[in-house]
């Protein structure tokens, strides 16, 4: 079991109950899922690019990514409806906790000139989104085998009702917010 999951059960729940005055343990916000998304615009010209991106995402997440297709045609971008343009992975349960632990403890400190993540990236309902410019910050990616440095989007979906609750939940996991 992931260390962060134990921390959540033993200390974070109690802290948040005291801080927000919840009556029940079930009212305490929890992390529902983590979604990793990689948009690959170059996939239109070369299909291999999408395969490499999917391979990177599979290595980072530990599960096979879903290839996302264009929802509608856009002439300006030269894409048609149904074209494969990216890949995504939704992590839940044990894999989610393990990924979050690796993200906070290993990957974020490896970001160049890292001073913390913005505390303003909440969506109004307690969910947090962030972008990573380089996939090579993850230890699962071998720098020598990377064909191109790509970024990815990470969305942490919580059951929090407000941004304040979501921020408190992530801060309890020592999420590195910028001061």
UniProtKB/Swiss-Prot annotation:
HAMAP family: Ribosomal_uL5_B (MF_01333_B). It comes from the Bacteria. GO terms for cellular component: ribonucleoprotein complex; ribosome. One of its GO terms (molecular function) is rRNA binding. Belongs to the universal ribosomal protein uL5 family. Pfam families: Ribosomal_L5, Ribosomal_L5_C. GO terms for biological process: translation. Signal peptide: none annotated. Part of the 50S ribosomal subunit; part of the 5S rRNA/L5/L18/L25 subcomplex. Contacts the 5S rRNA and the P site tRNA. Forms a bridge to the 30S subunit in the 70S ribosome. This is Large ribosomal subunit protein uL5. Keywords: Ribonucleoprotein, Ribosomal protein, RNA-binding, rRNA-binding, tRNA-binding. InterPro entries: Ribosomal_uL5, Ribosomal_uL5_bac-type, Ribosomal_uL5_C, Ribosomal_uL5_CS, Ribosomal_uL5_dom_sf, Ribosomal_uL5_N. This is one of the proteins that bind and probably mediate the attachment of the 5S RNA into the large ribosomal subunit, where it forms part of the central protuberance. In the 70S ribosome it contacts protein S13 of the 30S subunit (bridge B1b), connecting the 2 subunits; this bridge is implicated in subunit movement. Contacts the P site tRNA; the 5S rRNA and some of its associated proteins might help stabilize positioning of ribosome-bound tRNAs.
